[in-house]
Amino acid sequence: MTKTLPKDFIFGGATAAYQAEGATHTDGKGPVAWDKYLEDNYWYTAEPASDFYNRYPVDLKLSEEFGVNGIRISIAWSRIFPTGKGEVNPKGVEYYHNLFAECHKRHVEPFVTLHHFDTPEALHSDGDFLNRENIEHFVNYAEFCFKEFSEVNYWTTFNEIGPIGDGQYLVGKFPPGIQYDLAKVFQSHHNMMVSHARAVKLFKDSGYSGEIGVVHALPTKYPFDANNPDDVRAAELEDIIHNKFILDATYLGKYSDKTMEGVNHILEVNGGELDLREEDFAALDAAKDLNDFLGINYYMSDWMQAFDGETEIIHNGKGEKGSSKYQIKGVGRRKAPVDVPKTDWDWIIFPQGLYDQIMRVKADYPNYKKIYITENGLGYKDEFVDNTVYDDGRIDYVKKHLEVISDAISDGVNVKGYFMWSLMDVFSWSNGYEKRYGLFYVDFETQERYPKKSAYWYKKVAETQVIE
């Protein structure tokens, strides 16, 4: 049976400042930790990325032509405050006013994120969100933006608090590149959630117009053998690290007893302790019912198997299928069922996981209000032929995920939109320029844009709301 989506559904495309803009030192932009980290550790940098800093009128015109009626944009904190605090950079402010005006001119609603992996270097090198002073700096930056950019109707505090802690302190593929420090992972999650809560409360107390929420990456975790209690436990612990700890903070305003039991077990095995304060929980509690929406970024699921041994994680950044490894002491290891398809980067393709995650939010956090799927898409080594890309695999991937969103809506969940990652090809943080996601192919040499086959397909779905 052909499935449909509501008439008022947002069919969006997603971007992020650092992955798309380029112009990393232009017009007074301050440095971010990624600038030097990429130079020192990777085979690429964020120059020129997709040159969105200059080419945004082209991308927004294409968006309008191809039925894309929403765009995720992030503000680069260091374009507004080059050192994260203190002096404002007027050229950065002017750029975003111009960008938002162009969005509205093209009838593409901007959903604006304040922080997408790019803390200004001055604050990042001072402990990033492990340093509680940076909570204050973030809230001040948020307040400036709420006041200044009154043309924005949809605000998101953070993009993917989970993968920030994970990338910076567990896998170690994000600056500062620390590995296997679970206490830092949870402390980063917690302090960022307090920052989120305080910004949301300020937004509501000040009576700003528009809506505010947060974007969480929520990869669904399953036991490898659902009949084995040890595998079930491994999946539960892995879910706490990546999903439940953060969701509890967002919607319960505290961590449930079951969540804290899991956290304490993980820290007993791996070492370290957390600094969780009374005033933190007061802030979390005050904001728990104020989120207007939850953004869910979903790409994949994982299967977990019980495991007794030391932590070892190998990140597959070059698309060499089968080269990744993930096992955490006291938690478990990832082991995929043989019959589930994977990308070249070992990301498991499992649309059912998105449905299950959406239904979990509805069941466990009934105060969620509404959901946007704020990222979903297929990273691929696209072949550019005849000025396009025949990306049937991407079409199939997006189609199947839109279908389960339709199912979730039928089953009573309030899902209001979908943003494909990514609008145009951008650079991928730890995978470079080879891993493409866009509806529009970018020739990174010339910065020309070419609609892929998926763009024509997406346009038809957006126009008809029929998934076929």
Swiss-Prot record:
Gene Ontology MF term list: 6-phospho-beta-galactosidase activity; beta-glucosidase activity
Catalysed reaction equations from the record: a 6-phospho-beta-D-galactoside + H2O = D-galactose 6-phosphate + an alcohol
Stated name of the protein: 6-phospho-beta-galactosidase
Family: Belongs to the glycosyl hydrolase 1 family.
Record-level GO BP terms: lactose catabolic process via tagatose-6-phosphate
Involved pathway(s): Carbohydrate metabolism; lactose degradation; D-galactose 6-phosphate and beta-D-glucose from lactose 6-phosphate: step 1/1
Protein's organism: Streptococcus pyogenes serotype M3 (strain ATCC BAA-595 / MGAS315)
Organism phylogeny: Bacteria, Bacillati, Bacillota, Bacilli, Lactobacillales
SUPFAM superfamilies named in the record: (Trans)glycosidases (SSF51445)
InterPro entries (UniProt xref): 6P-beta-galactosidase (IPR005928), Glyco_hydro_1 (IPR001360), Glyco_hydro_1_AS (IPR018120), Glyco_hydro_1_N_CS (IPR033132), Glycoside_hydrolase_SF (IPR017853)
Residues that coordinate or bind D-galactose 6-phosphate: Q19, H116, N159, E160, N297, S428, W429, K435, Y437
UniProt cross-references to PROSITE patterns, sorted A to Z: GLYCOSYL_HYDROL_F1_1, GLYCOSYL_HYDROL_F1_2
Keywords from the named record: Glycosidase, Hydrolase
Enzyme class: hydrolase
Pfam families on file: Glyco_hydro_1
Signal peptide as annotated in the record: none
Active site, renumbered: E160, E375
Keyword Hydrolase attributed: yes
Assigned EC number: 3.2.1.85
